Each structure stands twice: as C-alpha cells, then as structure tokens.
Amino acid sequence: MTKKKTNTKAGSNTIALNKKARHEYFIEDEFEAGMELQGWEVKSLRQGKANIAESYVYIKDGEAFISGMTIIPLQQASTHVVANPTRIRKLLLSRRELDNLFGRINREGMTLTALSLYWSRSWVKIKIGVAKGKKLHDKREDLKEKEWQRQKDRVMKSALR
C-alpha cells in the first residue's frame, strides 16, 4: 500500500481574521461561502494582502455580496488591469443558505459579518457569522471574564512550580 500524501506546506490556511467581530457581536451561527474573485485578487491573497476588519455582508436581489473588504493589489501582478482594492465581491452560497440568511436578517434583525478568510484546498472561502450586536455592558462582562481567566492561569502556573 502507498502512504497518503501529507500536507507539507508550512504555515496556516488562514488569510485574514476579523477579531473585532467577536468583540462587537454575539455570533449565533456560521456559514462558509465561496467568493467570486479576479486573477490579481487571488495572487494578492496568496501573499496574504487582505483585510476584512471593516467588511460586512448584505443580500440584494437574492444574492449575497461582501462590501468593505480590502485586497491590496501586487505591483507586479496587476500592471495590465485597473485594480479596485475595495470592490464589492459576490459570495457563492446555495439557494437554501441564502433563503435562511435572508429570513434571519429580516425577521430576527440579525447582521451578517465576515469572520475569517481562508484557503480550502485551492479555493478561497470566507466564514460568515450571523450576529447580534452587543451592548456596552456585555463587552465589559467579556473583558472581566477574560481578565479572571488570566488571573486563574497565573495562579495555577505559580502553584505548579
């Protein structure tokens, strides 16, 4: 029998993370979507030149789009094309997923936000979170819990020595 090929690539499959989203919102559910990209965008993503911190997802005419995502063009890759780093990109979701998201936005008042951008084999995928906004006191509670966890870890670490 032959051995299975192992992934020998060094590094992570993650291109960009939106850490701010988990601080600003309660994430109720997550979906994975493909993206419609141009050639220069794929080359830039291979170099990790993307930012999804200020991006949001909306549904228009039964299709999902992401706005506010920035992909910085490479100088050598996009010489013959006029590159728009902040263009609106179409997301590839199934009809059932689109209907589910559309219903949750309209009925429950939820928001769609981008959580992470990553490689799945040779395809770029984006993780979308169905989110509800946090109030200021919720953010404070999260910070208190995080600080309490750090203190517990410090005490346990010193007790084990």
UniProtKB/Swiss-Prot annotation:
UniProt GO MF annotations: RNA binding
Cellular compartment(s): Cytoplasm
Alphabetical keyword list: Cytoplasm, RNA-binding
GO cellular component: cytosol
Native organism: Vibrio cholerae serotype O1 (strain ATCC 39315 / El Tor Inaba N16961)
Coiled coil regions, renumbered to chain: none
GO terms for biological process, alphabetical: trans-translation
PROSITE patterns listed in its UniProt record: SSRP
Name recorded for this polypeptide: SsrA-binding protein
Role of this protein: Required for rescue of stalled ribosomes mediated by trans-translation. Binds to transfer-messenger RNA (tmRNA), required for stable association of tmRNA with ribosomes. tmRNA and SmpB together mimic tRNA shape, replacing the anticodon stem-loop with SmpB. tmRNA is encoded by the ssrA gene; the 2 termini fold to resemble tRNA(Ala) and it encodes a 'tag peptide', a short internal open reading frame. During trans-translation Ala-aminoacylated tmRNA acts like a tRNA, entering the A-site of stalled ribosomes, displacing the stalled mRNA.
Chief location: cytoplasm
Family indicated by similarity: Belongs to the SmpB family.
